[in-house]
Amino acid sequence: MRLHRLRARLNAVAFGLLLLLVHGQGPEIVQPEVDTTLGRVRGRQVGVKGTDRLVNVFLGIPFAQPPLGPDRFSAPHPAQPWEGVRDASAAPPMCLQDVESMNNSRFVLNGKQQIFSVSEDCLVLNIYSPAEATAGAGRPVMVWVHGGALITGAATSYDGSALAAYGDVVVVTVQYRLGVLGFFSTGDEHAPGNQGFLDVVAALRWVQGNITPFGGDLNCVTVFGGSAGGSIVSGLVLSPMAAGLFHRAITQSGVITTPGIIESHPWPLAQKITNTLACSSSSPAEMVQCLRQKEGEELVLSKKLKSTIYPLTVDGTVFPKSPKELLKEKPFHSVPFLMGVNNHEFSWLIPRGWGLLDTMEQMSREDMLAISTPVLTSLDVPPEMMPTVIDEYLGSNSDAQAKCLAFQEFMGDVFINVPTVSFSRYLRDSGSPVFFYEFQHRPSSFAKIKPAWVKADHAAEGAFVFGGPFLMDESSRLAFPEATEEEKQLSLTMMAQWTHFARTGDPNSKGLPPWPRFNQAEQYLEINPVPRAGQKFRETRMQFWSETLPSKIQQWHQKQKNRKAQEDL
């Protein structure tokens, strides 16, 4: 009898062990599956801190064919269908880039860095959808375009799970070709340029045809992006190629009118690139053919091209005219727009990436003028007038710290603040609802990596928009587990504002801070733990760039004209 009981007990233990082997010691792993027009995908399910809501995550879904071989430098082609179930549970490779150049991005928040493998076969997107979202549920869709100066970045660096869970939206993060592969242009049919921009357009087309089974509303799509991603988003508003593909837009510290982000005459840069890569030719066709035969790594790892900027191109099709001309003529898509900047844009992250930190700390007037000359030239400021611009910021200050702060303020205005305010005014005057913000909070995590004088650095708001304090995967670049209670609340508020704007075209809702519309009075929201409405953002400086400086330049040109007339007598 005792032997019988022992056998029964051993059998029970064995059965229990079998159950543990089959099911594991934790909850059963859920692998959600969804049918797209191209085939079935299997993702994974994740949790989010502070809520019981689960999120279905699908990574690396192709929206276009791999741009390889003869398709290098070409517009993207629609992805091909697949058989069976495609695994969409692992992070996809980043688009081919110099991984070393991506190191600077670890200083966005707290020193974390996510490096994924790289590949030219990278035209994929990630989807984060609330687990209870069913086909046809009709949740707002938010499509994120990452930044990185158009040369670095990855969709998977932006974990959309917290934003999806707390905002009850479907988040899509997209990848696009970068650097020479994404933006090389000969200015003609052989390499028109803008292929990285067209990748984003192709992703938006894919969303229109496939987002419904993931619980998204194809008639409620918001494009949003930060830094260079913001430049692409604002370009989507101006480009006829993106008509009807989205319904609202958000830019964070970047617009297409930023100096150097778009070029009307790409040929000189094409010559520089091909000369460096031993593909020099007077024939654009031969140039492109030579570049197509190169290994991808050779194109992106050339040390001689390390500091090269690869801009968008005014090609007559994607961008029929320059952005400034399009803004003045108002032929663009009139959609609700939320846009803004941070209060210390050029403080540390960008100067570090540009190798200017040491120079900045010992800045002289001559240094400031030399560094500023290229950008002022691109803004059509005559060399004789450039000292006037420097004096506006530097004044009579001789103190090293004052010069450093003046340089930071100048560069932040030129590259981000002035273009963003100008863009918002054009949108407002076209009749588009516009909501403007200045993010003013210094993340507590900066104490580990940045000097105490750095305030809200470039891209600092991203961790709050994406719910960094609530991300379960603490290795994620925007994960912010050390956030204070005050910062957690700020993140919850910003997620609610961004997603309510995506839902309605207005960031105002019950329980949220009042956010005035950017109209002729130019009111905006100062975002920090105690938000308040502001008016006439940086009024004196904005007036200098929009009125005072143009007037002085006009007077200078008139004097030159009069002098020449006198000399001709």
Swiss-Prot record:
It comes from Pongo abelii. This is Carboxylesterase 3. CDD domains: Esterase_lipase. It is found in: Endoplasmic reticulum lumen. The lineage of its organism: Eukaryota, Metazoa, Chordata, Craniata, Vertebrata. One of its GO terms (cellular component) is endoplasmic reticulum lumen. Disulfide bonds join C95-C122, C279-C290. The keyword Endoplasmic reticulum applies. Its main location: endoplasmic reticulum.
